[in-house]
């Protein structure tokens, strides 16, 4: 019997949860010569949603995670590798030979792909410009390539003025749709919404929200009904109350609940035992994370774990409090809705359980 919940990887097909309105909006927008910017906290399902859109659009696609790009040359090599996956090497050899800096190609028999490498001390800007130009040159005007740049805010750390150079190239391209994904809201907003930014209003801006509770209730009910029986309604409510409809944590907790319903003999405290299992399972990870915070950050996290609002923590100076919250939010440990809250509900339980 297969677990009907999936998390930690791209969620697709039967595991994909709702997002029908967002999916249709993305597909309509990318049907024209337009670009898309999507911002949301980590693990809200941006990558899964875009993967679903690409699957349904059936267009050539290049998907790059910019967290893996440690330099402009590395980003160029990533673009090359993705291009080689799309186009047979014999068809693009001549095009590659016309680049200002021709890469050295190597074949990886393990995955059947070609990779590009460049000589040491190569001109990084030229190499990257060539790679970005290739995206346009090799794209079919009748079947435009969609280029997804995940965690795009990371690009700012690769080189001075890289945003200006990329914008100058991309704005001239007619055969590519760019999709920019990012989880650091303040940085992404600065890149695409500040008037002086090179990427100001470069595409449609979408803020991906949590999945509506009604939709998640239906999704969970359909998948828990067989195992939970008349307990289904109470379990669904408990799961969503705990996770706040966060896509990742909802699937994670529901998965453990389902496992316990199906495989455990004692079903008297299924929900409580599932939560305890998740907290215990991540105990070492949470401890390492906790030790990485300074004292002020720990005090704030303890307050949030006790459901205190930020403005109630008057034992900390206002500037100190909000500077620390801003850093925690930037790194994804805290998210801001109506109030600040700890992003991981099970980390919240871990903190509360040790705060006494």
Regions found by a protein language model. Give the residues of each.
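P-loop NTPase nucleotide-binding core
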Residues: 32-35, 39-44, 48-145
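C-terminal leucine-rich, beta-strand-based interaction scaffolds used for sensing/assembly
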Residues: 2-3, 276-356
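Alpha-helical DNA-recognition elements
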Residues: 56, 165, 256, 327-331
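C-terminal helical "lid" of AAA+/P-loop NTPase domains
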Residues: 236-242, 248-262, 299-302, 326
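A short, basic N-terminal segment
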Residues: 1-36, 41, 89, 356
